[in-house]
Protein backbone atom coordinates (compact mmCIF):
# COMPACT_ATOMS: atom_id res chain seq x y z
CA UNK A 1 0.00 0.00 0.00
CA UNK A 2 1.41 3.35 -1.01
CA UNK A 3 2.22 5.73 1.78
CA UNK A 4 0.05 8.82 2.01
CA UNK A 5 1.92 11.85 0.80
CA UNK A 6 2.55 14.44 3.47
CA UNK A 7 0.57 17.56 2.54
CA UNK A 8 2.16 19.65 5.28
CA UNK A 9 3.91 22.76 4.05
CA UNK A 10 6.69 24.26 6.10
CA UNK A 11 6.70 27.96 6.93
CA UNK A 12 9.57 28.37 4.46
CA UNK A 13 7.47 26.81 1.66
CA UNK A 14 4.52 29.04 2.49
CA UNK A 15 6.70 32.15 2.60
CA UNK A 16 8.35 31.19 -0.70
CA UNK A 17 4.96 30.78 -2.39
CA UNK A 18 3.81 34.12 -1.02
CA UNK A 19 7.01 35.77 -2.23
CA UNK A 20 6.56 34.28 -5.71
CA UNK A 21 3.02 35.64 -5.87
CA UNK A 22 4.20 39.12 -4.93
CA UNK A 23 6.99 38.91 -7.51
CA UNK A 24 4.62 37.98 -10.34
CA UNK A 25 2.15 40.62 -9.17
CA UNK A 26 4.74 43.42 -9.37
CA UNK A 27 6.38 42.07 -12.52
CA UNK A 28 3.11 41.84 -14.43
CA UNK A 29 2.03 45.27 -13.21
CA UNK A 30 5.31 46.93 -14.20
CA UNK A 31 5.22 45.22 -17.59
CA UNK A 32 1.66 46.46 -18.11
CA UNK A 33 2.83 49.99 -17.34
CA UNK A 34 5.72 49.71 -19.79
CA UNK A 35 3.59 48.24 -22.58
CA UNK A 36 1.27 51.24 -22.66
CA UNK A 37 3.78 54.04 -22.20
CA UNK A 38 3.53 55.13 -25.84
CA UNK A 39 0.71 55.90 -28.22
CA UNK A 40 1.23 55.38 -31.94
CA UNK A 41 -0.70 57.53 -34.41
CA UNK A 42 -1.56 56.72 -38.04
CA UNK A 43 -0.43 53.12 -37.84
CA UNK A 44 -1.75 50.96 -40.70
CA UNK A 45 -4.76 48.86 -39.60
CA UNK A 46 -2.75 45.68 -40.16
CA UNK A 47 -0.21 46.66 -37.46
CA UNK A 48 -1.30 45.92 -33.89
CA UNK A 49 0.11 48.64 -31.56
CA UNK A 50 -0.10 46.35 -28.52
CA UNK A 51 1.94 43.65 -30.25
CA UNK A 52 4.34 46.32 -31.47
CA UNK A 53 5.08 47.70 -28.00
CA UNK A 54 5.25 44.29 -26.32
CA UNK A 55 7.78 43.10 -28.88
CA UNK A 56 9.92 46.22 -28.55
CA UNK A 57 10.04 46.00 -24.74
CA UNK A 58 10.54 42.23 -24.69
CA UNK A 59 13.26 41.91 -27.32
CA UNK A 60 14.68 45.43 -27.63
CA UNK A 61 13.54 45.89 -31.24
CA UNK A 62 10.95 44.86 -33.81
CA UNK A 63 10.84 44.88 -37.60
CA UNK A 64 8.43 47.06 -39.60
CA UNK A 65 7.92 45.99 -43.20
CA UNK A 66 5.51 46.29 -46.11
CA UNK A 67 5.20 42.78 -47.44
CA UNK A 68 4.18 42.58 -51.14
CA UNK A 69 1.58 39.92 -50.29
CA UNK A 70 0.09 40.83 -46.89
CA UNK A 71 0.86 44.52 -46.55
CA UNK A 72 2.32 46.27 -43.52
CA UNK A 73 3.46 44.05 -40.68
CA UNK A 74 5.28 44.36 -37.36
CA UNK A 75 7.42 41.28 -36.92
CA UNK A 76 9.68 39.79 -34.28
CA UNK A 77 13.02 38.43 -35.37
CA UNK A 78 16.74 39.08 -35.30
CA UNK A 79 19.09 41.75 -36.58
CA UNK A 80 21.29 40.16 -39.24
CA UNK A 81 23.51 40.85 -42.21
CA UNK A 82 26.60 43.00 -41.80
CA UNK A 83 27.23 45.91 -39.44
CA UNK A 84 28.24 49.22 -40.98
CA UNK A 85 30.65 51.88 -39.71
CA UNK A 86 27.93 53.22 -37.36
CA UNK A 87 27.31 49.75 -35.87
CA UNK A 88 23.94 49.47 -37.60
CA UNK A 89 22.90 46.11 -39.11
CA UNK A 90 21.78 46.14 -42.73
CA UNK A 91 19.23 43.30 -42.59
CA UNK A 92 16.39 41.98 -40.44
CA UNK A 93 15.42 38.31 -40.32
CA UNK A 94 11.73 38.08 -39.41
CA UNK A 95 10.74 34.94 -37.54
CA UNK A 96 7.28 35.67 -36.16
CA UNK A 97 4.62 32.98 -35.88
CA UNK A 98 3.35 32.36 -39.40
CA UNK A 99 5.80 34.76 -41.03
CA UNK A 100 9.38 34.18 -42.15
CA UNK A 101 11.32 36.66 -44.25
CA UNK A 102 14.58 38.58 -44.54
CA UNK A 103 14.66 42.16 -45.75
CA UNK A 104 17.15 45.01 -45.98
CA UNK A 105 16.96 47.77 -43.38
CA UNK A 106 16.44 51.40 -44.28
CA UNK A 107 19.05 53.25 -42.22
CA UNK A 108 19.89 56.31 -44.32
CA UNK A 109 17.74 58.52 -46.55
CA UNK A 110 20.34 58.52 -49.33
CA UNK A 111 20.44 54.71 -49.45
CA UNK A 112 16.86 53.80 -50.32
CA UNK A 113 16.02 50.60 -52.23
CA UNK A 114 12.90 48.63 -53.01
CA UNK A 115 11.46 46.18 -50.46
CA UNK A 116 13.29 47.65 -47.50
CA UNK A 117 12.04 47.72 -43.92
CA UNK A 118 12.78 49.56 -40.68
CA UNK A 119 13.97 48.31 -37.30
CA UNK A 120 12.20 50.02 -34.39
CA UNK A 121 14.51 50.03 -31.39
CA UNK A 122 13.58 50.26 -27.72
CA UNK A 123 16.55 52.51 -26.97
CA UNK A 124 19.97 53.37 -28.35
CA UNK A 125 21.38 50.19 -26.82
CA UNK A 126 18.74 48.08 -28.59
CA UNK A 127 18.10 46.23 -25.32
CA UNK A 128 14.96 44.93 -23.64
CA UNK A 129 13.15 46.65 -20.76
CA UNK A 130 12.21 43.40 -19.02
CA UNK A 131 15.46 42.48 -17.19
CA UNK A 132 15.33 45.78 -15.28
CA UNK A 133 11.64 45.27 -14.47
CA UNK A 134 12.43 41.77 -13.17
CA UNK A 135 15.05 43.26 -10.86
CA UNK A 136 12.67 45.94 -9.55
CA UNK A 137 9.88 43.38 -9.09
CA UNK A 138 12.20 41.19 -7.01
CA UNK A 139 13.14 44.13 -4.78
CA UNK A 140 9.49 45.13 -4.28
CA UNK A 141 8.41 41.55 -3.56
CA UNK A 142 11.23 41.05 -1.04
CA UNK A 143 10.28 44.23 0.82
CA UNK A 144 6.63 43.15 0.81
CA UNK A 145 7.65 39.82 2.37
CA UNK A 146 9.70 41.56 5.07
CA UNK A 147 6.76 43.86 5.84
CA UNK A 148 4.47 40.84 6.22
CA UNK A 149 6.94 39.14 8.58
CA UNK A 150 7.25 42.27 10.73
CA UNK A 151 3.48 42.70 10.85
CA UNK A 152 3.01 39.07 11.82
CA UNK A 153 5.60 39.41 14.59
CA UNK A 154 3.34 41.94 16.31
CA UNK A 155 0.65 39.28 16.84
CA UNK A 156 2.61 37.03 19.24
CA UNK A 157 4.82 39.27 21.40
CA UNK A 158 4.65 36.91 24.44
CA UNK A 159 6.06 33.38 24.75
CA UNK A 160 5.15 31.23 27.79
CA UNK A 161 7.19 28.14 28.67
CA UNK A 162 4.84 25.22 29.43
CA UNK A 163 4.79 21.44 29.75
CA UNK A 164 2.08 18.82 29.30
CA UNK A 165 1.00 19.17 32.93
CA UNK A 166 0.44 22.92 33.09
CA UNK A 167 -0.18 23.91 29.47
CA UNK A 168 -3.99 23.98 29.78
CA UNK A 169 -3.84 26.02 32.98
CA UNK A 170 -1.48 28.53 31.40
CA UNK A 171 -3.73 28.84 28.34
CA UNK A 172 -6.67 29.64 30.62
CA UNK A 173 -4.59 32.24 32.45
CA UNK A 174 -3.55 33.85 29.17
CA UNK A 175 -7.16 33.92 27.97
CA UNK A 176 -8.08 35.87 31.09
CA UNK A 177 -5.12 38.16 30.49
CA UNK A 178 -6.28 38.76 26.91
CA UNK A 179 -9.79 39.42 28.21
CA UNK A 180 -8.50 42.22 30.48
CA UNK A 181 -9.62 40.42 33.63
CA UNK A 182 -9.04 42.72 36.65
CA UNK A 183 -8.04 39.72 38.79
CA UNK A 184 -6.71 36.35 37.66
CA UNK A 185 -7.25 33.43 40.05
CA UNK A 186 -4.98 30.39 39.81
CA UNK A 187 -4.90 27.07 41.63
CA UNK A 188 -2.56 26.98 44.59
CA UNK A 189 -0.76 23.98 43.10
CA UNK A 190 0.48 26.07 40.17
CA UNK A 191 4.22 26.65 40.56
CA UNK A 192 4.49 30.38 39.89
CA UNK A 193 8.19 30.42 40.77
CA UNK A 194 8.99 28.33 37.70
CA UNK A 195 6.61 30.20 35.41
CA UNK A 196 8.71 31.59 32.55
CA UNK A 197 7.40 34.34 30.28
CA UNK A 198 9.44 35.73 27.41
CA UNK A 199 8.53 38.96 25.63
CA UNK A 200 9.71 38.98 22.04
CA UNK A 201 9.21 42.75 21.72
CA UNK A 202 9.56 42.65 17.93
CA UNK A 203 10.18 46.26 16.82
CA UNK A 204 7.52 47.76 14.55
CA UNK A 205 9.36 48.91 11.44
CA UNK A 206 6.59 48.61 8.84
CA UNK A 207 6.59 52.38 8.34
CA UNK A 208 10.31 52.39 7.56
CA UNK A 209 9.96 49.39 5.26
CA UNK A 210 7.08 51.07 3.43
CA UNK A 211 9.25 54.15 2.95
CA UNK A 212 11.98 51.97 1.44
CA UNK A 213 9.46 50.19 -0.79
CA UNK A 214 8.18 53.56 -1.98
CA UNK A 215 11.76 54.60 -2.74
CA UNK A 216 12.17 51.51 -4.95
CA UNK A 217 8.78 52.20 -6.56
CA UNK A 218 9.80 55.79 -7.30
CA UNK A 219 13.04 54.52 -8.80
CA UNK A 220 11.26 52.23 -11.25
CA UNK A 221 8.78 54.99 -12.12
CA UNK A 222 11.72 57.27 -12.91
CA UNK A 223 13.28 54.47 -14.96
CA UNK A 224 10.11 54.29 -17.06
CA UNK A 225 9.78 58.07 -17.30
CA UNK A 226 6.65 58.29 -15.12
CA UNK A 227 6.16 61.18 -12.69
CA UNK A 228 6.47 60.13 -9.05
CA UNK A 229 7.50 63.16 -6.95
CA UNK A 230 4.20 63.40 -5.07
CA UNK A 231 4.27 59.83 -3.81
CA UNK A 232 6.34 60.87 -0.79
CA UNK A 233 5.47 64.23 0.77
CA UNK A 234 5.82 66.40 -2.31
CA UNK A 235 4.92 69.43 -0.21
CA UNK A 236 8.30 69.12 1.52
CA UNK A 237 10.20 69.52 -1.73
CA UNK A 238 11.24 72.96 -2.88
CA UNK A 239 10.55 74.06 -6.45
CA UNK A 240 14.12 73.44 -7.60
CA UNK A 241 14.00 69.87 -6.28
CA UNK A 242 10.70 69.18 -8.05
CA UNK A 243 12.04 70.67 -11.30
CA UNK A 244 15.23 68.61 -11.03
CA UNK A 245 13.21 65.45 -10.42
CA UNK A 246 10.95 66.22 -13.39
CA UNK A 247 13.97 66.75 -15.64
CA UNK A 248 15.41 63.39 -14.60
CA UNK A 249 12.08 61.68 -15.27
CA UNK A 250 11.74 63.35 -18.67
CA UNK A 251 15.29 62.32 -19.59
CA UNK A 252 14.52 58.73 -18.62
CA UNK A 253 11.36 58.72 -20.74
CA UNK A 254 13.26 60.17 -23.69
CA UNK A 255 15.54 57.12 -23.67
CA UNK A 256 12.60 55.16 -25.10
CA UNK A 257 10.80 57.97 -26.94
CA UNK A 258 13.84 59.08 -28.96
CA UNK A 259 14.42 55.66 -30.52
CA UNK A 260 10.74 55.34 -31.48
CA UNK A 261 10.61 58.82 -32.99
CA UNK A 262 13.68 58.08 -35.09
CA UNK A 263 11.96 54.93 -36.37
CA UNK A 264 8.81 56.96 -37.16
CA UNK A 265 10.88 59.36 -39.26
CA UNK A 266 12.46 56.50 -41.20
CA UNK A 267 9.11 54.77 -41.77
CA UNK A 268 7.55 58.04 -42.94
CA UNK A 269 10.45 58.64 -45.35
CA UNK A 270 10.33 55.09 -46.67
CA UNK A 271 6.56 54.56 -46.95
CA UNK A 272 5.05 58.05 -46.69
CA UNK A 273 2.86 57.08 -43.71
CA UNK A 274 3.54 60.15 -41.53
CA UNK A 275 3.65 58.05 -38.34
CA UNK A 276 3.74 59.73 -34.94
CA UNK A 277 4.49 58.39 -31.47
CA UNK A 278 4.04 60.17 -28.15
CA UNK A 279 4.21 59.47 -24.45
CA UNK A 280 0.80 58.42 -23.15
CA UNK A 281 0.71 60.63 -20.06
CA UNK A 282 -3.01 60.43 -19.29
CA UNK A 283 -3.43 56.65 -18.99
CA UNK A 284 -0.04 56.10 -17.34
CA UNK A 285 -0.76 58.83 -14.80
CA UNK A 286 -4.14 57.26 -13.98
CA UNK A 287 -2.53 53.85 -13.44
CA UNK A 288 0.09 55.43 -11.19
CA UNK A 289 -2.56 57.23 -9.11
CA UNK A 290 -4.55 54.00 -8.79
CA UNK A 291 -1.42 52.20 -7.57
CA UNK A 292 -0.71 55.02 -5.11
CA UNK A 293 -4.26 54.82 -3.74
CA UNK A 294 -4.01 51.06 -3.24
CA UNK A 295 -0.70 51.43 -1.40
CA UNK A 296 -2.10 54.21 0.83
CA UNK A 297 -5.08 52.05 1.82
CA UNK A 298 -2.86 49.01 2.44
CA UNK A 299 -0.71 50.90 4.95
CA UNK A 300 -3.54 52.94 6.50
CA UNK A 301 -2.79 56.32 4.95
CA UNK A 302 -4.70 58.79 2.85
CA UNK A 303 -3.02 61.52 0.88
CA UNK A 304 0.34 60.35 2.18
CA UNK A 305 -0.50 61.12 5.85
CA UNK A 306 -0.76 58.46 8.54
CA UNK A 307 -4.20 58.15 10.10
CA UNK A 308 -4.10 58.64 13.82
UniProtKB/Swiss-Prot annotation:
Keywords associated with the record: Capsid protein, Late protein, RNA-binding, Viral capsid assembly, Viral genome ejection through host cell envelope, Viral genome packaging, Viral penetration into host cytoplasm, Viral release from host cell, Viral short tail ejection system, Virion, Virus entry into host cell
GO terms, molecular function: RNA binding
InterPro entries the UniProt entry points to: Gp10 (IPR008016), Gp10_sf (IPR036199)
Stated role: Forms the portal vertex of the capsid. This portal plays critical roles in head assembly, genome packaging, neck/tail attachment, and genome ejection. The portal protein multimerizes as a single ring-shaped homododecamer arranged around a central channel. Binds to the packaging RNA (pRNA) and ATPase gp16 motor.
SUPFAM superfamilies: Upper collar protein gp10 (connector protein)
Name used for this protein in its record: Portal protein
Any GO BP: symbiont genome ejection through host cell envelope, short tail mechanism
Gene3D superfamilies tied to this protein: 1.10.246.30, Bacteriophage PHI-29 conector. Domain 3 (3.30.1350.20), Upper collar protein gp10 (connector protein) (2.40.500.10)
GO cellular component, one term: viral capsid
Subunit description: Homododecamer.
Species of origin: Bacillus phage B103 (Bacteriophage B103)
Subcellular localization, as worded in the UniProt entry: Virion
Lineage of producing organism: Viruses, Duplodnaviria, Heunggongvirae, Uroviricota, Caudoviricetes
